[in-house]
Amino acid sequence: MKNNYTSLKSPLDEEDELKTDHEIDLEKGLLPEYNSEEEGTLPLYSDISKLANPVPEDSSTGPTEIANPNVERRQEFKDSHPNIYFLLRLLISVLAVSVVFFTAWVCVNPLEKSIFGKVAFSVTIGITCPILFIATFCFFETWTQAVAQCIKVTVIFLAQCVKVTVIFLAQCVKVTAVFLAKCVKVIAVGLYNSKKDLVVTIWLAWVVICFILFGCVKDGRLNLNKALICSTCSISAALFFILLLVCIPIWTLKHMLFGLFQVLGVQSCVVIVTKGLMYLFDKHIDATGYEIEASSLFVIGNFLFFYEMERPGALKRMPKFIGNGIASFLGGLGNAFGGIGNAIGRIGNAFRGANDNNDIPLGEMDVESEV
């Protein structure tokens, strides 16, 4: 019987099998060249993978840890200079033991006569110092690494604390500055809207302060020169400046400063005139002179302040006003003296006419009477 077996594979499946026979495994790389003569020398894929990855991998330990450069430098120094490294360990250990010994000696020395002091000193010398020396010398690398790590962590922590503190303080300063600016703005607007009440309140406070200072001067508890400066120039100038700054809009700052300097100039002139008069008439300056000077400055300061507040720009117009007043006064004096002169001339003419009438003869008087 003939075998009528027919393959169930389609032509497409056969083509796929032919293709897969010649495909390359990308993970294992290219296949090595096959030599038919030396068929037994064909390397395996495992050998090829070992050649491609020469670094051995230990699945139990995982990837190798990165070495610490400080540890490597220390190991190199230890290998290259063993004697110096040994002396360094010994020196540091001796220094640590010496510090503990002298600390114990200073602390226990006052208690040397007592049993507790002797026992503590003996324990420190006999047990603590040897243990500390052995631990420091034998475990030098361990505790130095721990100390270095602790110092590093501490420095990083302190740096972070300083950074956070600086940022926090900057934020606090910013918030405080903004808050104060808003408060000043609100207060300034409120004071400007109620400047009449503010003027009266501060003027009353000013009067009370000046009277208190005058009372201290009179009572002898305050120096006259200090009282004069505090009660007149400083207080009047400061209050005048503050009140003008608050009560007058900011665009009149030039006018405010000009008025302030005018007030100070007037007060300086009063001081100079008062000093000159006191020097001319009384060389021995006593408390009465200071009281007169302080009272004059106080009255002038109040007058100029209220005059400026009621009529802004009055101080600027004051020189012209004073000049016009002086001119009017002198013109009035001139007119007065002219009127007095005219009156005197008329009186003289009247007397002259009376004298002329007395010189007429009697005959002429009879003729005139007949006519």
Swiss-Prot record:
| Lineage: superkingdom | Eukaryota
**Keyword Coiled coil in annotation:** no
Q: Which UniProt keywords apply?
A: Membrane, Transmembrane, Transmembrane helix, Vacuole
Q: What kind of membrane protein is this, topologically?
A: Multi-pass membrane protein
Q: Which GO terms describe its biological process?
A: meiotic drive
The similarity annotation says: Belongs to the WTF family.
Identification of the protein by name: Meiotic drive suppressor wtf18
Task: Please give the organism.
Answer: Schizosaccharomyces kambucha (Fission yeast)
- Taxonomically, what lineage is the organism? Eukaryota, Fungi, Dikarya, Ascomycota, Taphrinomycotina
